Every structure is written in structure tokens, then in C-alpha cells.
Amino acid sequence: MTRAGFVAGNWKMYGNLVQNQELLAAIVLGIPSLQNASCAVCVPYPYLAQAQSVLKGTHVAWGGQNISQHHQGAYTGEVSAGMLTDFGCRYVIVGHSERRTLYGEDNQMVAEKFHSAQEQSLVPILCVGETLAQREANETEQVIARQLDAVIGLVGVNAIKQSVIAYEPVWAIGTGETATPQQAQDVHAFVRNRIAAHNSEIAADIQIVYGGSVKANNASELFAMPDIDGGLIGGASLVAAEFISICFAAQS
């Protein structure tokens, strides 16, 4: 792994004030520094102020799990990119498979959210990936190509440089299933090559992380693959020791 490693924890809809305080404090204590790697936690909206309070001035960044594609307006229940920056966020996840599947977010909407994030100087963590049915139909590359092309078509390839791409095989999310390191590497290489068709320098530099049931006991093997630069971590990010171990595995 020649690029700097990156690990982001996605807490999803878990946590409370007491648990968060303990978890964040443990992560800060466990990660005083990283060599050629960085890490972040993406927390539920109500806990952004808490994350900011605990993490400010540490080696751990923080961010959100979703944003509206709109900057402001009569959009009840929505949260804008600018609101996240008010809480010091550096990152935001866009296009997570759960957003696409449960809330009907299509490629165009995800592209608009990506653009909205960058307009407010947030780094989007763009999720791409295929379902089990799509994989079994040998449609993995076509699906991911459409997801990437929607973003590049809207913002241009230069904007991709200021982002992180997360490959999440939907069939491996929360199931305990994990793509083999080689299966994950093959898709990561495809993503990098797809970007390289537009700009090889950007493709060489961009961080592409893996988001399919990464745990402390498989992180090192996954991150050793040449095109896997870290992970987007779900359940394991809620356990301090697991998350810390994964972050250290991303060092190079």
C-alpha cells in the first residue's frame, strides 16, 4: 500500500451519550498517532457536538453519515453539508448501500450529495458496491461503473481527487461474510482503473477503502492488497480495541 492509509468508523444508528464518551475517550487514548495513515469516526447527527468536544486537537477526525443534496430550504428532517461543517466535520459518507437500498437514493442523488459536500469543503466518502444478485449475474463492474460515472459526470474527475472511495460489497454488509482479499482487490483495481481512464495521476493517488465486514483479525490481510488503502468500518468501530487495531493495521 503506497498511499497513506485511511480508516473511518461508521457508527450507523448506534450509541448514546454515556457509551459514546467512553468509546471516543478510549479511541483517543489508543491512537496517540499513526504512521502514514489517518482515521475518523462518522457519528449520528445528535452526537456531532460530543465528537467535536472529545476529538478536537487529537489525531482522530469526525464526520457525518449522510447529508442533503440541498444547502438549505423547506426540507423537513434533512441536514445540510454546511451544518456538518459548523461542528468541525471533515468527512461525510455519501451513497452508503443502506441509503441506496432503504431510502431509494439513486446514482444521480448520490452525485448531487457528493457535490454538495465538496462545496462546503467536506471530504465525501463515496460508497460504491453491488448486491448479491448483481454479483451472481456478473454485473459487479457495470454497477460500480454507473455509480462512479454519475459522480464524475456531474463534478468532473478533478473533484474525485478530494474524496475517498469506499467499496462495500452489499452482500457482505452486516452478514459476517467477507470478500476474500483477492476478490476485494479485484474490485478495487477496477475502481482505480475506471478513474485512470479519466486521469491516471488522480487514480494513483486516491484512497480506495474496503467496507465489507472488516475486523481486527482480517484487516492486515485486506490492507496488504495493493489497491486497498484502508477500511470503512461498521460494527467493529463500536468496539474500541477492534477499531484501534484496524487503524494501526492501515499504517504503512
UniProtKB/Swiss-Prot annotation:
Lineage of origin: Bacteria, Pseudomonadati, Pseudomonadota, Betaproteobacteria, Nitrosomonadales
Assembly behavior: Homodimer.
Record family assignment: Belongs to the triosephosphate isomerase family.
Group of enzyme by EC: isomerase
EC number(s) from the headed UniProt entry: 5.3.1.1
GO molecular function term, any single one: triose-phosphate isomerase activity
Record bears the keyword Amino-acid biosynthesis: no
Disulfide bonds: none
Stored InterPro entries: Aldolase_TIM, TIM_sf, TrioseP_Isoase_bac/euk, Triosephosphate_isomerase, Triosephosphate_isomerase_AS
Gene label: tpiA
Protein name: Triosephosphate isomerase
Catalytic site positions: 96, 168
Residues noted as binding substrate in the record, renumbered to the chain: 10-12, 174, 213, 234-235
